[in-house]
A protein has these predicted regions:
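Bimodal "functional hotspot" detector
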Residues: 1-144
Length: 144
């Protein structure tokens, strides 16, 4: 028979940036968990669109941001991004972009560290951000 697409609602904590792009601000959102899209991919894509009701938030990601794949293995979330991640967001520091993703992913409790690749390759530097190819853990010092 046909495989039904299962879904349930889950509350997740997402990290957006403030208007000046130098601090992270978290907020809770509801996500519809689908069995055909990994939760990790879904929450990353949600970072492109802050809730309309929160006027003080902006997206830490460019609108052409795209996730190729996410996978959880050994408490690590492996995230393969498209090269669009290299398009800097106006007025947002790279470390804010990176840790918005890392903090959001590690808050899901499926992994405590994140390994990024771009189109399948480890990239040591993302614009101004060094060590983009290392295992990254959450950073709350950037939170407002």
């Amino acid at each position: 028979g046909e495989k039904s697409i299962y879904s349930e609602k889950k509350k997740v904590k997402l990290y957006y940036t403030n208007k000046t792009g130098d601090k992270l601000i978290s907020c809770f959102r509801e996500v519809e968990v689908k069995n055909n899209v990994p939760l990790e991919t879904q929450v990353l894509l949600m970072l492109k669109n802050p809730p309309a009701s929160k006027k003080n938030l902006k997206s830490p990601l460019s609108q052409d941001f795209h996730v190729n794949q996410t996978q959880i293995m050994n408490n690590t979330c492996y995230v393969d991004l498209s090269s669009d991640i290299e398009n800097a967001v106006a007025d947002v520091k790279e470390k804010i972009t990176v840790y918005a993703m890392v903090n959001t992913l590690t808050d899901l409790d499926t992994a405590y560290q994140v390994q990024f690749t771009i189109d399948g390759k480890r990239v040591s530097k993302l614009n101004e951000f060094e060590k983009f190819d290392t295992l990254l853990t959450s950073n709350f010092s950037l939170c407002k």
